[in-house]
Amino acid sequence: MKIALLGNPNTGKSSVFNMLTGLRQHVGNFPGVTVDKKVGEIKIGEETHMLIDFPGTYSLYPRSKDEQVVYDVLTDPSNQDYPDLIMVIADASNLERNLFFFSQIYDLGMPCVLVLNMNDVAQRAGKHINIEKLKEAFPGASIEGSNARLGTGKERILSLLENAADKRPESKFLKGSEIC
């Protein structure tokens, strides 16, 4: 299974990648561009899966080469990096901005996991996140908290990934080619 690791810049995405892969990564480029990608392996149960760390992205409506790479991969099932599952890392202390991007990913209708990272920063700021409300807002998405910098939440994330592959939200994302 290919798992795409996505999120806004500075959400701790690389920390989650390193926590899940144990720093086992390969750096390469996406075909045709100079944007780096990191690929690592994670073990879920008895199976080994590929985790692809994509560049930090604010939106599926690309404004940079990095965002264009993410858009191209996620909207083209024939792309060699097209994922079976998407994991979005969100900064729990800045959830509104991060949920904007997650809502776009969710609307693709692909199996997805939302990891609320940096819970300690959110708590110090006096923020309490109601995960049940998030699950109501995004039915079919798997949602969990973590603090990758401290190494907490790894087993819960792996469990979510194992169970999320069969959950598929209804797609609300339309490409122009589907309409015209």
Short names for language-model regions:
Residues 15, 19, 72, 156, ...:
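Alpha-helical scaffold segments in soluble metabolic enzymes
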Residues 32, 56-57, 92-95, 118-123, ...:
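Conserved nucleotide-binding/hydrolysis micro-motifs of P-loop NTPases
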Residues 32, 36, 64-67, 71, ...:
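Amphipathic alpha-helical transducer elements in NTP-driven molecular machines
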Residues 120-175:
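Canonical P-loop GTPase G-domain recognition
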Residues 1-64:
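Conserved G1/Walker A P-loop phosphate-binding module
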Residues 178-180:
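Extracytoplasmic
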Residues 45, 69-142:
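Conserved C-terminal guanine-recognition region of P-loop GTPase G domains, centered on the G4
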